[in-house]
Amino acid sequence: MSKHTVLFELGCEELPPKSLKTLRDALQAETVKGLNEAGLNFASVEAYAAPRRLALKIVDVDAAQADTQKRFDGPAVQAAYDAEGKPTKALEGFMRGQGITVEQLSTFQAGKVEKVCYLKDVKGQSLDTLLPQILQTALDNLPIAKRMRSAASRTEFVRPVKWVVLLKDDQVIEATIQDHKAGNVTYGHRFHAPEAVTLAHANDYLAALEKAYVVANFEKRQATIQEQVKKLADEVNATAIVPADLLDEVTSLVEWPVALRATFEERYLAVPQEALITTMQDNQKYFCLINAEGKLQPYFITVSNIESKDPTQIIEGNEKVVRPRLSDAEFFFLQDQKQPLASRKEKLANMVFQAQLGTLWDKSTRIAKLAVALSSITGANPADAEKAALLAKCDLTSELVGEFPELQGIAGTYYARIEGENTEVSEALGEQYLPKFAGDVLPKTKTGTTIALSDRLDTLVGIFGIGQAPTGSKDPFALRRSAIGILRLIIENELDVTIEELVNLALQGYGDIVKDHDKTRADAVAFLEGRYRAKYEDQGVAVDVLQAVQALAPKSPLDFDKRVNAVNHFRTLPEAAALAAANKRVANILAKEATPEGSVVEANLVEDAEKALFAELQAVTPVVEPLLAAKDYTAALSKLAALRAPIDAFFDGVMVMADDAGLKANRLRLLAQLRNLFTAVADVSVLQG
């Protein structure tokens, strides 16, 4: 069968930049799905996207579907013919319905019944016939929240459609898509090459558009932007901040990218750089530049959509536009300094945290008491912890945070520094929100760790205390993410404390506000322990490793983590699979038989294999017990791995369930001793091979 290259392009008014990449990928996926469902084979489907177009290149696609046979089932053979072999009324009705004669009938086996059927030859439909509907269906299925209809069109799309190209090699496929007749005419850059571009062949698409100042390939356009931005940054010994989302958005805004470096007045560098970066990135779509120390430099890079003969005009225009933005940030920053952080508590007293749990000032005072209590665990200075907690939420009332909400905490750090607070206090104000997401950094200061823990615990316990725990997809206070943050803060700072101890400390701050302390405690502890799975699955830890540790229900997150790491290491050992299987066998035996009281009686060991296992247990126990006491579980399991050979020999040569009651009891005690050594770390019997 012959193969073809097909080009499809949908030309539109400017598409939403934040959706362009998603629309391209969805169009590609939906088209691939449609081709597969139609039985049209192809080598690849390449997808392109630029501000005014979505396009696909389908390589080596079949010219038509393969011819097939469709089976139409009739009555059972037994019911199809009478005693003389003539068609019954049932068969005659079937043939009449299909418009066929007896000569065209076939039979097939349906289970134990042989049935009559008609095998109809079905000629495959052509690519030209099938493709327009496949593409239209793909467009209809795109993830578009709000569609619009242009005045002259009966169809809807995310933006008004202006032209459609549908080429099979060098031939136009006759079709109407999105109420536009397909052709071989596309259009170049709106300003550099606004005239029509006629495509002679589907393979000419990318080259023809580049001549018309359009880079249709999204990744190529993006790589060009990255190269240009890096070159401009290198020229001033700086590094560009290039967030992935911003890079995608800028790539979606331009057809012919030209990066330009501009400047702003150095006086604005006195403003918190986070505010300047936020306004330049979010509002202006600029790339900011920093030096080797991470300090913002008085430059920014804009990506223009035109290749100007006088780029200075574009640069000056952008400098003029950004100046008021930076001036606003400077104004807010200076205005805020007129009111000390501590004096803002009155405003916090009028800001509701949660209707039943009080104001933000109520929360601040609870956090302060909790932070003082936690200081003995985190090693923070209690006075620093209390002061930082009372100042922690004050910047929420500031002008700067009002304009840039993402600067909460960060603004507080700047103001605290200006007011002369020590490093522990000032840095804690920004660190209180860390970690913000999975894999985010943790607070560097002990005070920051203390406030971050206190804030999260206060919220979690309070919300559980008023019966508003997360349910299903509803988690308005982001308690699931917060719980993982609590676990990370404990584990990665090596805080030796149980979850219940922390919950109890947080409960003390609520007093009578929380009516049922016992239920709240139980629910909050269970919730936090339930987040272990999400935390460790993000790290790639297998579920059976978690189950092995959870079987022991460790109370301390730090202890839990050490056990997880130990089991994770253990399962990489060559002895692990055999020892896990042996432990499972031991667990099954002990589950069916009550372990007799007392210790193993050495004199009652009669088989060489059981004597050898006992001797190994006696030798390894005094080595392992100090390791367990030191919570060096990895070393403990590594030592226990040496028991594989004597355990295997024991099960090969010893009958545990001996007829002699004394021998049986002694062997059960021996297995219990073995089992207890392993379960002092984890229940390795649940590990899969």
From Swiss-Prot:
The keyword NADP does not apply. InterPro entries: DALR_anticod-bd, Gly-tRNA-synth_bsu, Gly-tRNA-synth_heterodimer. Keywords: Aminoacyl-tRNA synthetase, ATP-binding, Cytoplasm, Ligase, Nucleotide-binding, Protein biosynthesis. SUPFAM superfamilies: HD-domain/PDEase-like (SSF109604). One of its GO terms (molecular function) is arginine-tRNA ligase activity. GO terms for cellular component: cytosol. It catalyses: tRNA(Gly) + glycine + ATP = glycyl-tRNA(Gly) + AMP + diphosphate. Pfam families: DALR_1, tRNA_synt_2f. Its main location: cytoplasm. It is found in: Cytoplasm. One of its GO terms (biological process) is glycyl-tRNA aminoacylation. Tetramer of two alpha and two beta subunits. This is Glycine--tRNA ligase beta subunit. It comes from Acinetobacter baumannii (strain AYE). The gene is glyS.
